[in-house]
UniProtKB/Swiss-Prot annotation:
GO terms for cellular component: chloroplast nucleoid; chloroplast thylakoid membrane; nuclear matrix. This is MAR-binding filament-like protein 1-1. Interacts with PTST2; the interaction is essential for the initiation of starch granules biosynthesis in leaf chloroplasts, for the correct location of the process in the stromal spaces between the thylakoid membranes, and for the association of PTST2 with the thylakoid membranes. One of its GO terms (biological process) is starch biosynthetic process. Residues 134-722 are stromal. Keywords: Chloroplast, Coiled coil, DNA-binding, Membrane, Nucleus, Plastid, Starch biosynthesis, Thylakoid, Transit peptide, Transmembrane, Transmembrane helix. It is found in: Plastid, Chloroplast; Plastid, Chloroplast thylakoid membrane; Plastid, Chloroplast stroma, Chloroplast nucleoid; Nucleus. Residues 1-50, 51-84 form a transit peptide. The C-terminal part is necessary for DNA-binding. Residues 1-20, 687-722 are annotated as: Disordered.
């Protein structure tokens, strides 16, 4: 174990010393902070390896301390001038090592091998002498390398000075170019500022115009709301009219249903009339049989026929009087036609009234004709019966029973006929009433339909005008959009030019700042290098210390460089952020300009819309005034027509009164005819009773008919008055 330790110790010492010298001389070239960190990381691993065997480490440490002490002493004596710092460090290190060796020697004084170790130390000192010679050779090599490094530093300084001169000349040229660019940019900036001022003035003018147009727009909006309210009222009136129409149509449907029911009843009554007529035909066949039996008695009653002819002449006279009265009615109709000609606007209502009057007249004439026919037939039958009774008075006595039965059946049939005639007349009156109500409802419906057509026509006109206005609005919008697009394009071009000029100015300013900072840093570095070179020339002997200082300076410079690089990166990031903020600001300005242009467009559109709405308002006012005039004229026409209708109703009542008078006169004439008949029949005593019975029946029939006519005229007059 001991023999193995001796030869290793001087070698390790020589290597340690040579490595320490080389590291002290070549640290700025070979080692870096990263290598130092790696070595520091490796040291604890080596310490762990050596701490495995404590006893062997103690012996080795003692031996190394001794050999180091012997090897360091001659080095300190020879190289005291060149390596003062190293000698001081080695002395400082040697003192604790000697103390440790002394302590170890004192601790191990009792060791019997100490004498052998001392001998071996002397032997090792000889070996160390040879190693010392090798160390001196290495020292000479290191001195040569130091001188070569100094020469290289001088060359680098010369190149550095030349680079500084070139850099300064380039900076001057760049400054001149930048000054020219700045002048140009200033001129462009002034031009852009002038453009901006003009644009601001235009914007202010547009803002004032916008405010004025907003006021006008608000006023027009108020007017539009008023017009909309008027339209809503018109729509409500339209809805009301439609509801009234629906009600009228419902009434018409109800009346039509009633008419259908009445027609069905009339048909039933006609069927019953046909059945009764068939029964009458049967009875008439029986009467014909009796007439064949009474033909012989006709010769006796020829005298009576002459008298009856005279009565007929009187009846014809009365009929002529009736015809004269009818001619007076025709004159009244002529007057009515003249009134209708004068009132052209109320033709429709007068035509309807004339139709009603003609229908009433035809109905009255038909009634009179039917009554006359019935009277003629009854008179003929009475004459036949009287002749038959005159000739066959004897047979009548025989056949009294049969005659009484026949008369009873005849009376029953007449009563049935009268009842059915009354029902038919009532139904006819109801039909007339329903027809009148239908005609009135139709006239109302026609008026309402005309009003609806007028309102629809007005609505269509308004819709057409609104569509025209919308087309004009769209055309104005397109033209305004084109103008706004052109203005936007010009503003965008100006904004782009402004942004480019601003960016160029900012870039030039930033480059100037960066160049100034770089120049300041370069000047500071030059000053530092000059001071360091002076120190190198003055302190050539203290090269090691200066190299250490330079190392520290290099480290600090590297730190400063890293710090400066970090600052540069930060400044770049801040510059990017500022550029982004500038871009955002420019975008916001562009958006503001766009919004201003959009507001200008909206104002122009609002102005155009307001003008169009004003035109619409004027048109609507004109149309409303025209409608009011038309409505007033229609009301006046309706009032005139109503007055005419009232006059015609009064004339109709007067005519009805005259007709009643004529009917009364007819009834009185019939009474006189009956009186004459009674006088004629008073000659024949046996037939008097039967003739009286028949005259009473005829009088009852005539009274009933007059009552029917009165009842028929009363509801008609009530309807006309209603």
């Amino acid at each position: 174990m001991g023999s193995s330790c001796f030869p290793q110790s001087p070698l390790s010492h020589s290597l340690f010393s040579s490595s320490s010298l080389s590291s002290s001389q070549f640290t700025p070239l070979l080692f870096s902070p990263r290598n130092a960190q790696k070595c520091k990381k490796k040291m604890p691993a080596m310490a762990c390896i050596h701490s495995e065997n404590q006893k062997e480490s103690e012996f080795c440490s003692r031996r190394t301390i001794l050999f180091v002490g012997f090897s360091v002493l001659p080095l300190l004596s020879l190289r005291a001038n060149a390596f003062e710092g190293l000698s001081v460090d080695s002395q400082v290190k040697a003192q604790p090592q000697k103390e440790e060796t002394e302590q170890t020697i004192q601790g191990n004084a009792e060791n019997p091998f100490f004498s052998l170790l001392n001998g071996l130390g002397v032997f090792g000192s000889g070996v160390l002498g040879s190693l010392y010679a090798l160390a001196r050779n290495e020292k000479a090599v290191s001195d040569a390398t130091i001188e070569s490094m100094k020469n290289k530093l001088k060359e680098k300084e010369a190149t550095f000075v030349s680079m500084e001169k070139k850099f300064q000349s380039e900076l001057l040229n760049e400054r001149d170019i930048r000054n020219n660019q700045l002048k140009r940019a200033g001129e462009e900036r002034q031009a852009l500022v002038n453009q901006l001022n003009s644009a601001k003035s235009t914007v202010t003018n547009l803002g004032q115009e916008l405010q004025k147009e907003k006021r006008i727009a608000e006023e027009l909006i108020v007017q539009i709301e008023g017009l909309q309210n008027n339209l809503m009222q018109m729509k409500e009136d339209k809805k009301k009219l439609q509801e009234e129409l629906k009600e009228k149509l419902d009434l018409i449907q109800v009346l039509q249903e009633k008419i259908t029911l009445l027609t069905t009843e009339i048909k039933d009554k006609e069927a019953s009339l046909q059945s009764t007529t068939s029964k009458l035909a049967e009875k008439e066949s029986e009467v014909d049989k009796l007439s064949s039996m009474y033909q012989e008695s006709q010769d006796q009653l020829m005298n009576l026929t002459s008298e009856i002819k005279e009565l007929k002449v009187e009846v014809q006279k009365r009929e002529r009087e009736l015809e004269l009265k009818r001619e007076s009615e025709d004159n009244l109709n002529v007057r009515l036609n003249s009134l209708l000609v004068e009132r052209d606007e109320s033709k429709k209502e007068l035509d309807a009234i004339q139709k009603e009057y003609s229908e009433f007249k035809s109905i009255s004439e038909k009634k009179v004709a039917s009554d006359a026919k019935l009277l003629g037939e009854q008179e003929k039958r009475l004459h036949q019966l009287e002749e038959q009774l005159g000739t066959a008075s004897d047979e009548v006595r025989k056949n009294n029973v049969l005659i009484a039965d026949l008369t009873q059946e005849k009376e029953n049939l007449r009563r049935m006929l009268d009842a059915e005639l009354e029902n038919i007349s009532k139904l006819k009156l109801e039909v007339q009433v329903t027809q009148e109500t239908l005609e009135k409802s139709r006239s109302d419906a026609s008026d309402i339909a005309q009003q609806l057509q007028q309102s629809r026509h007005l609505c269509s006109k308004l819709e057409a005008e609104v569509s025209k206005l919308q087309m004009e609005l769209e055309e104005t919008r397109t033209s305004l959009r084109r103008n706004i697009d052109e203005t936007k394009r010009g503003a965008e071009l100006l904004a782009a030019e402004l942004t480019t000029t601003r960016e160029l100015l900012k870039k030039t300013n930033e480059e100037m700042h960066t160049m100034s900072h770089e120049l300041a840093a370069v000047t500071e570095n030059c000053d530092n290098l000059q001071t360091e070179l002076v120190d190198v020339y003055k302190k050539a002997e203290r090269a090691a210390d200066e190299l250490k200082q330079e190392k520290n300076i290099v480290v600090t410079l590297e730190k400063e460089l890293t710090f400066l690089e970090a600052q540069i990166t930060r400044e770049k990031e801040s510059r990017k952020n500022l550029e982004e903020e500038l871009e955002r600001a420019t975008e916001s300005l562009d958006e503001m300009n766009r919004n201003a242009f959009a507001l200008a467009k909206e104002l122009e559109l609002a102005n155009s819309h307001i003008s169009s709405l004003e035109d619409e308002r004027e048109v609507l006012q004109k149309s409303v005034s025209e409608q009011k005039q038309i409505s007033q004229e229609s009301r006046e026409n309706l009032e005139d027509a109503h007055s005419l209708v009232m006059k015609l109703g009064k004339e109709r009542e007067s005519l009805e009164k005259r007709a009643k008078k004529l009917e009364d006169e007819m009834a009185s004439a019939k009474g006189e005819i009956l009186r004459l008949r009674t006088q004629v029949n008073s000659v024949k005593a046996p037939v008097n009773n039967e003739e009286k019975v028949e005259a009473g029946e005829k009088a009852a029939v005539t009274v009933k008919r007059t009552r029917r006519r009165k009842t028929a005229t009363q509801p008609a007059s009530q309807q006309e008055s209603s």
